[in-house]
Amino acid sequence: MMNRFRKWLYKPKRSDPQLLAQFYYADEELNQVAAELDSLDGRKDPQRCTLLVNQFRSCQDNVLNIINQIMEECIAHERANRDFCVKFPEEIRHDNLAGQLWFGAECLAAGSIIMNREIESMAMRPLAKDLTRSLEEVRNLIRDQALRDLNIYTEKMKESLRHFDVLFAEFELSYVSAMVPVKSPKEYYVQQEVIVLFCETVERALKLGYLTQDMIDDYEPALMFTIPRLAIVCGLVVYAEGPLNLERKPEDMSELFRPFHTLLRKIRDLLQTLTEDELHTLERNLCISQDVEFPANADPEVPSAISPVLVTALPTEEPPMAKAENTEVELACSMQYDEQELEQLNMMVHRVGDEMSSLLSPPSVYQSPAHRANTSNEASPCRRALDNLTDEEDRVFFMEDLDGSGEVLARSRPSETTISWVNNSCYNAKQPALYQDSVLQNGDLADVVSVKDGQRDISNNNNIDGSKMLAASASLQNSCSCLEAPESQLYLNGWDTNGEDAETAEIIAHRTGGMKISATVIFNPKSLTNSPETSPNLASNRIPSSSDPLTSNEEDESHKLSIAATNCLINSCVCCGSCEDTREDSLEGLRNVPSSGKVINASYSLIKSKELGHLDRSDCTVSAKELLKMDSPTVLLAEKETTRQEQPYPNSSKCLPLNSGSQVEMDSESDEPLTASRDQLRSESNRQETGNKERPSEEVEEPPSDRASADNITSSSSSQDGLRDSALSSISSSDYESVSVTTCSLSSIDSLSSCSSDDIDQEEIQLALQAAKIASRQKIRSRFHSSNDLIHRLFVCISGVADQLQTNYASDLRSILKTLFEVMATKQETDDKGKQKKANQGLRSAALEDCALCQETITSSELAAKARDGEFEDPPDWVPDEVCSLCTACKAPFTVIRRKHHCRSCGKIFCSRCSSHSAPLPRYGQMKPVRVCTHCYMFHVTPFYSDRAGM
């Protein structure tokens, strides 16, 4: 009864602007809607139910907004911390978020659960109950105070508001975190790095003329697309150590670019092959919002991205089919399937690792999907090139791991390319003998490096045609001429190249002081696998003969022994004859392998030429003759089997199964030093070589004297005792197939210091690596018809990634661009405040000189005082419609669509665009927002502008 009397006596007026009065009526409206909603059967009238629910939530928003204003007024300095709100996505940070939270809290308190969030719902239910209970208490206290005194906030009400504010902030964080992903501090730090990258990109674009400052100041809409595109290029090339550093783990990258990690790696590899002019052209094209048309039939010659310093060291590779007339091949890289290109790029996942770890790891034997085995028996390089281009048309383009990094993929080649050359086409008699007789038959070197059990045989030369076989025989007989048949195919780093590139390997080998095999491995780290046509021959060659007691169970051990023995031979050559002890230890370990038969690789002609070449070195203290003598029994037996099986070509080197009685017996127990002079060793080597060539095809056994001599020679101690513990001398039999020649070559650099005149400098090793890198880049560029084709591919891929950011990460991208514009927009000079004030006053007077309200001397504070006292002015007279045919502000003519609107503040006529604001006009008694023009809204309605301008 007392409450009714007080309500009747002290009930506030609806027009009262005080917060407690406004809350009273807002809460009354909420209670009415809630009561009607409770009494309504939603199944009978669903439309009415939906309407009431929306009205109920709107009333909740209104009540919470007024409570928030009351808290800002009475406990302004005691509010709960809400810094976590910056973590929320922009799309949920709106005015009615509080009402949604209240509605969610009531649902959870009533026992409901959030869909697919059962655990979070159970955890938040106690907090939701506390929040609804506290909110009900706050509402009762504020209603009671509104019926007592509208100007006083009691301590009890303040304490209740503090408790409610803390609970509401805690529930807001929990509820929003359960509904939407909230960034962690680490993710915010990464996003700040992305913002810095975008700012650096815009600053660079301004310097290079891609963008203008006016575009930034005017918030040009096209920049929403241009800036992310340019940022991808800068993040991959210019600022490679920034947030787009692909050497990081994907989980450490920004979530914007994390899904595109693989595609960005491919884009980076292509960007690194561009010249400065090409990069400039690409960035220019990326600044254009629409698609750019690239000429399809441009100059087929792709400009080289090689620095001028290395152009002479590595000649530019000419496209093998530059003059092809096949129009289908010309359209292989057609630009009509850009979307398909992007999808295929996303599917190409190839791991890319460290550069040196690739060079020091054994090559893989698996075929690359970019080089499938051809099924054609045609030996023409033109046909082979056409097939390769046809494959490229299917897969658009496939980027190899740049710099030889990552997982090294094996290559599958046709049978006609089973001979490859790595020697100089123009032999110079003054050059060391290292340059002689370096033929690699059937990928001799590469296949020795990595051989998988049961996948291929190293010694298959049955498919070599006559011209190639004659050339191979000439090479084995110390011929210095290169294979000039048109069917010959050269391999550099596993790719099709010309003879000049092979010459480069020789040059680098010569500069590095006898590391020709190492240089060759660097250029050719990928194994050459045989084509399907040669598989039957391989299978037949692997079957032991009737006189050979080898069984199928012993073939694995035989292959391991072959690999290890050949690696030891190559090791002795690469290390300039200073690793004899290492090779002795390796062969001693090989004797203990439990196998009744061995397979020894007969790459004797290659190793022999290398070792004889070392005899010409003036300062080497260790002769290579001992290496020849130690290896001679094995090699001679292998050559005997070679001459017996291939009568037409007696000089062909092969890797064949040996009889079980032919064991490798190397006795290294003697410690007598080597006393023979260099001339004697050279003459003995020549006799040994002559004897090998003239040996008949019948069974040959080693004389005891030769074996004794070999035992004495191999027992000599080397000055490099540290190499006894090298990788090749300590590996087990199960690890033989993973031994890498490159490991031996690089780990033996220290041993080369024994040759004082040919010390290998670190710069020359870097030169070899850089040359290999350049060859790799040239191979990537050779897959594109022209420079424009390459630029177009990059344009498509980069634009695709940047445009997907607009769709998948719109909120984050808007936040980044918003910060970007705030940072990069032109700042007003604040150094001279007097000049700025005068400029503002001049601008104000110039802008308002034709307005009657601007001529008044009364200030906004005086107008506010009059409004509080109830002294209202008469509204201005409206301009008649018939006397005005143009908008007062923009001078646009009025039409049926463009209607006339009067400003309630000045009475003039404007179009809808120039009078789109609403504001209360208390000086005229208008407490509700009414239509005003832009001029009045800026200069007369908004008090802070009027006061500041009048200072």
From Swiss-Prot:
Q: How is it modified after translation?
A: Monoubiquitination at Lys-87 prevents binding to phosphatidylinositol 3-phosphate (PI3P) and localization to early endosome membranes.
What PROSITE patterns does this protein's entry cite? ZF_FYVE (PS50178)
SMART domains per the UniProt record, alphabetical: FYVE (SM00064)
Q: Where is the composition biased (Basic and acidic residues)?
A: 679-709
Highest taxon listed in the record's lineage? Eukaryota
- Name the residue ranges with Polar residues bias: 360-379, 527-552, 645-665
Question: What Pfam families does its record include?
Answer: FYVE
**What's an example of a GO molecular-function annotation for this chain?**
zinc ion binding
For binding Zn(2+) 1, which residues are annotated in this chain's numbering?
A: 887, 890, 911, 914
Keyword vocabulary terms for this entry? Cytoplasm, Endosome, Isopeptide bond, Membrane, Metal-binding, Ubl conjugation, Zinc, Zinc-finger
Q: Which GO terms describe its biological process?
A: negative regulation of epidermal growth factor receptor signaling pathway; negative regulation of epidermal growth factor-activated receptor activity
Q: Which GO terms describe its cellular component?
A: cytosol; early endosome membrane
Q: Where is this region: Disordered?
A: 360-382, 527-557, 641-726
Q: Does the keyword Acetylation apply?
A: no
Annotated positions binding Zn(2+) 2: 903, 906, 933, 936
Location comes to:
Cytoplasm, Cytosol; Early endosome membrane
Q: Where are the zinc fingers (FYVE-type)?
A: 881-941
Where's the Glycyl lysine isopeptide (Lys-Gly) (interchain with G-Cter in ubiquitin) crosslink?
87
Leader sequence residues: none
Family membership noted in the UniProt record: Belongs to the lst-2 family.
Question: What function does this protein fulfil?
Answer: Negative regulator of epidermal growth factor receptor (EGFR) signaling. Acts by promoting EGFR degradation in endosomes when not monoubiquitinated.
What is stated about domains? The FYVE-type zinc finger mediates the interaction with phosphatidylinositol 3-phosphate (PI3P) and localization to early endosome membranes when not monoubiquitinated at Lys-87.
Q: Which protein, by its recorded name, is this?
A: Lateral signaling target protein 2 homolog
The primary gene name is zfyve28
